[in-house]
Amino acid sequence: MSASTEKKRRQAARETGTDRKQQAAERLAAEKAKSRFKWTLGTVLVVLLIVAILFLNSNVLFKSTTALTIGDTSYSPAEVNYRYASQFYNWANTYGSYAAMFGLDTSKGLAGLANQEYPDGGTWADFFKEEAVTAMIQTKAITDYAKAEGIELSAEEEADIEAEFAELDAIAQQQGYASVANLLAMNYGTGVNEDVAFEAGRESVLASKAVSAYIDTLEYSAEELEEKYQSYNGDNDYFDVVYYYVAAELVEAEDGSKAANEETLAAARVTAEEILAAYEALGVTEDEEGNEVAVEGLDVEQRLNDAIAQCGVEGTAIRTAKVTGSSLGAYQEWAKAERSEGDATVVDNSNGNGCYVVAFISRDDNHYPLAQVRHILVMAEADAEGVYTDEAKAAALARAEEIYAEWQNGEATEESFAALAEQYSEDGGSNTNGGLYDNVMKGQMVEEFDEFCFAGHESGDTGIVYGEAMGGYAGYHVMYYVGEGQLASDYIAENDLINTASQEWLDSLVEGYEAEKGFFFKLVG
């Protein structure tokens, strides 16, 4: 083949696309283009994946999506998280170590709720989520009511809320958190920050103010309060009784269970009746003419114990003082009838396994005025074993006397006492309100404190009393008697009426409010 012919062939091949070099060049160009396309697409996918990961791991989903809608308000997962955690913390603080009785181990914290079964089904996480939703519905209904009624937070109330949240900076630093946001997120859930917590706190304060405003509209006459208290039929009265329980012999049945039968229960009743007869005999004697007369001044508890001993029965009577009528058990109906000191009877136990010999000592129907007092608590310092030594108590007394002297040498008024209480008192329950307890009931405080409250003092009377609570504290109270409050019976009845009316009012407010859970509710908890 001539050179010219070969040249023409190559030219024709190029024109038709069949030249091998051209084909190779075109294939290389195509591969490069394909490679560039793959690289570009891969890069886009990687970038999108990175963005998705960052998005999911950020707070955006928790702050910008909707987890719950109530009426015209939407709540983000972060906002629900705060209420969810708050429900758990409030519950844990209320029940403390008793939470274990309900099957909850609070030591595992929020993270452990999803792995603990709730007794009625589901998990404890489910329980607290529903509690949070219920609370949010109520708060939403109340704050809507507040807006409709023109109830707003005052500048002072707003400042108080801001002051409380301002303290979070120091708390966060003290506990080693980089910021308040980190503190809140770690303890309340992802996305929870200062804004979320502040708004929830503000909302709660407004709701409380609205509830208080409603309660202030409730008024009850003395007749209404007395009628309400009498409707309890002695359930809220306090009783002082002494009893001895005669247990019937338990007989084993064919299935291995043990229980009293008619014969053994009858035998127990005979013993109880013998003790009762001996008790009654100890209460009478004969006068000079041979007539039976009651023995005056007998101690009821000692009398019952003497009767038990006379009958050759082992054991002693048990005294239950300051017990409400509703807690008396099998003999409550007998005790709540008209009784005099020393009355006694035999009552079968409701379980059919024995009977009581019970004697009546006294009954308090709560028709006494509540005490209003101020105090300054100076606590003794416990040693390493938790013991309050005489030296520690003496030091506390000396400090209490110093504070008392400071008050006496000053203006010596109720106002100056209140100021010293806020300055010196170690009672966290009253040292922010001048040491005031304005509705003290009998038996509510430690013994010496209680005795001061109900010793017939006049307004302005003062003194120092010792106080000690098992497992709590030991120390001295500088006391200031303010005066008498309302009757305890009226206080009990009024609180009951207010609680009932408030619940009915709240039920009417939340009627029509529903919570709609969104897709992102799954992020809660």
Enumerate the predicted regions with their spans.
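Sec/Tat-exported extracytoplasmic proteins
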Residues: 84, 88-91, 136, 140, ...
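Peptidyl-prolyl cis-trans isomerase
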Residues: 274-332, 367, 402-448, 482-483, ...
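N-terminal targeting leaders characterized by basic, low-complexity, disordered sequences
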Residues: 1-15
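Plant regulatory low-complexity segments
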Residues: 11-20, 88, 93
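PPIase-associated folding chaperone regions across multiple families
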Residues: 15-45, 52-63, 183-277, 323-398, ...
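Surface-exposed intrinsically disordered loops and tails
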Residues: 104-121, 284-300, 313-315, 325-337, ...
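N-terminal targeting/tethering segments
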Residues: 59-196
